[in-house]
Amino acid sequence: CLPLLWPPAVAPPPGGFWFTLLDAGQGLAAVVRTQHHVLVYDTGPKLGTTLDAGRAVLAPFLRQQGASRVDTLIVSHADIQHTSGVRSLRELMPVARILTSSPEQTPIDGAEACRAGQGWEWDGVRFQILHPPPAGFSDDNASCVLKVEGAAGRALLPGDIETAAETALTATYGTGLAAEILIAPHHGHRNLSTPAFLNAVQPRYVLFSTGYRNRFGYPRPETVARYQATGATLLNASDEGALTFRLEPGQALEPERYRREYRHYWTAP
């Protein structure tokens, strides 16, 4: 469901941020907006033979939100479900900085390596790269893991990390992983989201980014059961459309669900 008719926004207050997980098919595309800055985390998959999520989903959403540029683009790792919209997004608006886990494997001009320990602050909101370290991980386990923390809450974006990276993150950060909003690692793969990892994160909301009736069976039932056991609320963008959280002081943490808020007859169940 494309967010073309979403009502125009103003901007978060200082210390607040808006987090949106887009409905981008079997892949991932998310946007974090602070008062004066925009971050994009992954650019989604191809959508057929001639279209991709960068052109069809990300750019329209950003323009509707009043964004004229992307301050930082994080490409979590070299996987076409996460990278396919990069070129289109860069054609349609300026992108000031690009971080990715393996620049040598992701042919994106000007991309820099994301590494644990990197961080910055925009408008009172803290951005931290928690993973990967300089060596020891590859492929999905080398995904850039981003934590965003503002005055009203936190979001954890782990890309496609697998068990080895989950274990390392839990050992390194412990409860420092805590976040109200968690994007399920690797779309809800069956071997992920161990009890130790979930105990560290303690999410209130777990978000899945999967294709409708995808061939992988994501999210896997056994993984869903582990999340349900934590008491978290589980939401899937393929069911709900774009999911937006406005993390602002004094506001309840509740998702805006595109298909529920802006229902049309063609999106009715």
Give the location of each predicted region.
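Non-globular, low-confidence helical/coil segments that flank catalytic cores
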Residues: C1-P269
